[in-house]
Swiss-Prot record:
The protein's name: 2-C-methyl-D-erythritol 2,4-cyclodiphosphate synthase
Lineage: Bacteria, Pseudomonadati, Pseudomonadota, Gammaproteobacteria, Thiotrichales
Record: residues binding a divalent metal cation: D10, H12, H45
Gene: ispF
Gene Ontology process terms (BP): isopentenyl diphosphate biosynthetic process, methylerythritol 4-phosphate pathway; terpenoid biosynthetic process
Organism expressing this protein natively: Francisella tularensis subsp. holarctica (strain LVS)
Assembly and oligomerization: Homotrimer.
Length: 159
């Protein structure tokens, strides 16, 4: 059996030009939005990078350029579905995924189960294979000042 591990990280800053945020494919009511070329889903972006990293295929920016207008405001679930195809082509399966959302606000806990279900559906895996947790920075740094959100994701693949 062959194992591969990948790590992904993403961060987006808040903008008053939008309202509500999308994290893990779930829309969350908030008075600000996330500045991004796509929908700004930091969790899916980090997950894409983790899977691509484990496969040795670079990162999300290599495959979906942020200068390409076809990806302007696109739903990030599209990226994850495309990367699932790459995973299948390489004949790897997901053992587990562990995600950490770092945000002072809004609170993520009420939305985590919906996020897990959304990601499991796209990746065609069991919800039990995905862990999502959220933490704050105790009001330190740009996240603590509620200027943005960051996410780390680790995934383990096998074949």
């Amino acid at each position: 059996m062959s194992f591969r591990i990948g790590h992904g990280y993403d961060v987006h800053k808040f903008t008053s030009a939008k309202q509500n945020i999308i994290i893990g494919g779930v829309e969350i009511a908030y008075h600000l939005g996330l500045e991004a070329h796509s929908d700004g889903d930091v969790l899916i972006h980090a997950l894409c990078d983790a899977i691509l990293g484990a496969l040795g295929l670079g990162d999300i920016g290599k495959h979906f350029l942020d200068t390409d207008n076809q990806f302007k405001n696109i739903d990030s679930k599209f990226f994850l579905a495309e990367i699932k195809k790459m995973l299948d082509e390489k004949q790897y399966s997901i053992s587990n995924i562990d995600c950490t959302i770092i945000a002072q606000a809004p609170k993520m806990l009420p939305h985590i189960e919906k996020m897990r279900a959304c990601l499991a559906n796209i990746l065609e895996i069991q919800i039990s294979q995905i862990n999502i947790k959220a933490t704050t920075t105790e009001r330190l740094g740009f996240i603590g000042r509620e200027e943005g959100i960051a996410t780390h994701v680790v995934c383990l693949l096998y074949r």
